[in-house]
């Protein structure tokens, strides 16, 4: 078969593993949001957000539906959400959101990854970020999007049009109202539709290639952990 075949097979296996991990993360988020706030996304902000996020990430419909059915059926499985803070190479601030059935395991694994990859798991950096509702999509004109938002008197923080992509930032509590207005525009596909943490100040630029590689390795290792849902940072990569 040759080395080329081995490389392709390894690449396909890695892609399949990432897809499986993404499906698992989405299922946990949807299950917990539905269990805690009800299975109707129209009245459950958290559920609406994670479903939209799953769709934007191309999570299969059956994964979404099974997670909601599990919550509706009174499944006893329980997960706890936590946010961990740390510092990476070049003093980059890092937030790690987890959803786990074993808090001690999650905390220990996160500390281990930081310690083994030139990071500090004891940094306090949450104040450098804010949680916002974020949307991104193509094939719509800025004027019509603004008109839809203004007609509904929806509060947003910013609207950016860049490379034919419209990006909207809004207070995280305004997620449902913004999404309701955007739905009237019949947007075909959202590139981003979720609540996420973003840096309050300008991102840190890392010019040294080795340092940048060290940081990317740390971020990748954190993202690969079973209990990790999201990893946020304030670096320019």
UniProtKB/Swiss-Prot annotation:
The keyword Aminoacyl-tRNA synthetase does not apply. It is found in: Cytoplasm. GO terms for cellular component: cytosol. One of its GO terms (biological process) is regulation of DNA-templated transcription. Coiled coil: none annotated. GO terms for molecular function: DNA binding. Pfam families: TACO1_YebC_N, Transcrip_reg. Keywords: Cytoplasm, DNA-binding, Transcription, Transcription regulation. PANTHER family: TRANSLATIONAL ACTIVATOR OF CYTOCHROME C OXIDASE 1. Belongs to the TACO1 family. NCBIfam families: PRK12378.1 (NF009044). This is Probable transcriptional regulatory protein MCAP_0598.
């Amino acid at each position: 078969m040759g080395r080329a075949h081995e490389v392709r097979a390894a690449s396909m296996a890695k892609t399949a593993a990432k897809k499986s991990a993404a499906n698992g993360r989405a299922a946990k988020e949807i299950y917990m949001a539905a269990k805690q706030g009800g299975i109707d996304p129209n009245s459950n902000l958290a559920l609406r957000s994670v479903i939209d996020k799953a769709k934007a990430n191309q999570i299969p419909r059956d994964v979404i539906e099974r997670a909601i059915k599990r919550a509706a059926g009174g499944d006893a499985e329980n997960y706890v959400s936590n946010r961990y803070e740390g510092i990476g190479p070049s003093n980059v601030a890092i937030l790690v959101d987890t959803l786990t059935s074993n808090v001690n395991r999650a905390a220990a694994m996160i500390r281990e990854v930081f310690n083994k990859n030139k990071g500090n798991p004891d940094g306090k950096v949450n104040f450098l970020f804010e949680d916002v509702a974020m949307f991104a999509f193509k094939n719509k004109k800025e004027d019509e999007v603004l008109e839809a938002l203004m007609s509904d008197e929806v509060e947003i923080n910013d609207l950016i049009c860049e490379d034919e992509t419209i990006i909207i930032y809004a207070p995280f509590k305004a997620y449902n109202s913004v999404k309701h207005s955007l739905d009237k525009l019949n947007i075909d596909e959202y590139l981003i539709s979720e609540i996420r943490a973003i840096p309050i100040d300008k991102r840190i630029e890392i010019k040294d290639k080795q340092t940048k590689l060290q940081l990317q390795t740390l971020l990748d290792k954190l993202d690969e952990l079973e209990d990790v849902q999201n990893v946020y940072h304030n670096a320019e990569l």
